[in-house]
Amino acid sequence: MKRICSVSSVQLFSRSFRALASPRSLNYPLQCIKRSSVRMESSNFSSGVRTESSVKPRGALIVLEGLDRSGKSTQCAKLLSFLNGLGHPTELWRFPDRETSVGQMISAYLSNKSQLDDHTIHLLFSANRWEKRSLMEEKLKTGTTLIVDRYSYSGVAFSSAKGLDIEWCKAPEIGLLAPDSVLYLDISPERAAERGGYGDERYERVEFQKKVADFYQTLGDSSWKIINASDAMEEVEKKIQQVVLDQVKECTEGKPLSLLWSS
């Protein structure tokens, strides 16, 4: 088992984000951010993503979001089985990825084994996604559909619910790949709290989850599909499948990749 990094490692990591976290360094990017906007690239950028009409078929990037205990993990697993059963190469990813060195620090924090400043843990969550960014692009461009259990929206919603500025929270996420579709599993915090295992981790408190839900509503855009997570599990599963199959078809027809929250 990997050893969880020490607090001193967190301090070193946090200092490496000092330029990003300072208001001065964020001044220009924040002027350019447009809420819930995605820029379609028309030429090469540093990671090599292109969006000309000649783009080859690719995998779809499907993100499931929602409050804690909304059923995301269950539906992600069902969707994985469904797509693989249809012959679509598909993988299931989860954020945070607790297997990486950064992910282990996050895991310790979420299980109340360590204490971190709110800004520091937000940047760690963001770094955890950046750790997988190149591999994510590679998988998509070679035809693998990715089902992602939580993505940048969770990071921004949860940190904003703690009182951090929402635009500050979005800034470190700019440049990550934008999902082709976001499926938001909508459930009341009170209903979610009735489900098994609720309260095991730091953020599983009804009043806090209400704040998170409000910020999710702020972040939602045209790529989001709202699914009533209080419906029967089979009904939720069917609705998700319908949305995802449409996206998979578009991506196999050459739908271009795009970037998250870029003007």
From Swiss-Prot:
InterPro entries: P-loop_NTPase (IPR027417), Thymidylate_kin-like_dom (IPR039430), Thymidylate_kin_CS (IPR018095), Thymidylate_kinase (IPR018094). NCBIfam families: DTMP_kinase (TIGR00041). Pathway: Pyrimidine metabolism; dTTP biosynthesis. Pfam families: Thymidylate_kin (PF02223). PANTHER family: THYMIDYLATE KINASE. This is Thymidylate kinase. Its EC number is 2.7.4.9. It catalyses: dTMP + ATP = dTDP + ADP. Expressed in root, rosette leaves, flower buds, flowers and siliques. Disruption phenotype: Embryonic lethality when homozygous, due to arrest of the embryo sac development soon after fertilization. Residues 1-51 form a transit peptide. SUPFAM superfamilies: P-loop containing nucleoside triphosphate hydrolases (SSF52540). One of its GO terms (cellular component) is nucleoplasm. The keyword ATP-binding applies. GO terms for molecular function: ATP binding; dTMP kinase activity. It is an enzyme of class 2 (transferase). One of its GO terms (biological process) is dTTP biosynthetic process. Keywords: ATP-binding, Cytoplasm, Kinase, Mitochondrion, Nucleotide biosynthesis, Nucleotide-binding, Nucleus, Transferase, Transit peptide. The gene is ZEU1. Catalyzes the conversion of dTMP to dTDP. Involved in the regulation of DNA replication. Is essential to promote the first division of the zygote. It comes from the Eukaryota. Induction: Cell cycle regulated. Up-regulated at the G1/S phase transition and then decreases rapidly as cells progress into S-phase. Not up-regulated during the male and female gametophytic mitoses.
